[in-house]
Amino acid sequence: MLKKIFFFPILIVISFSTFSQNRNWDSLGKEAAKTEYYTPVPPVVTPGGLPQDAPSDAIILFNGKDLNAWHGEDSTKPAGWKIADGVITVDKKTGGIITKQRFMDFQMHLEWRIPTEITGSSQARGNSGVFLAYLGMANGFLEDGYEVQILDCYNNKTYVNGQTGSIYKQAVPLANACKKPGEWQYYDIIWKAPRFNADGSLKTPGYVTVLHNGVLLQNNTEVKGRTKWIGQPDYVAHGASPIKLQAHGDPSPPVSFRNIWVRPL
């Protein structure tokens, strides 16, 4: 479970479980920059309004009242995010929240909001993410799995493979459909999990479709492997996995969520 957050004056910031003061963040930042791309920039698209409520067969992950479907970074402890007015808001001190239930293929809907008073720039501005299959922590401080990025990209320049709706550090979104900070936005995600052979080798990769505010950003995109801040993505064998909402370590005000549901496929 995340105990303490420290912020470092580097260009790239990530979500942490534990920290070590002797890490060379300048050196890590330079390594991470090798997999950041700034062109071509996705076109800006003005999105429509919010969709309807969950369908009758959906599994409700957040009903506006409780977080009974989730636990904290430590699976023995409850999710630590606060609920107010039917909305949950990231608590960066307690870390991310993880579903108790595990999934393979699914359709997911979630609504999220960048705070009106957002500050910062690039990746340090309203950063969060949806891990479609969360696989634990890598190297003690990096989240492992497949991440769809959440970020304030309304007039906020960053590397395009880290933009809102990217498969982080892998697939650039087809458009920028971000609304102004303070407005509710939504993702509709179709996830087809990877399959593995008995010996652990990859049989078929994962594929993901992402619509942001009704605008197609990822169209059955092949996922190349686990999200990596530094280096290239790769696969490790796994089965059904939980979904995680990220508590990113940047110093900007936290992201909020509501109306989260999933339909196993």
Stretch-by-stretch model annotation:
Residues 1-22:
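Bacterial Sec-dependent N-terminal signal peptides
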Residues 21-265:
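Carbohydrate-interacting regions of secretory-pathway proteins
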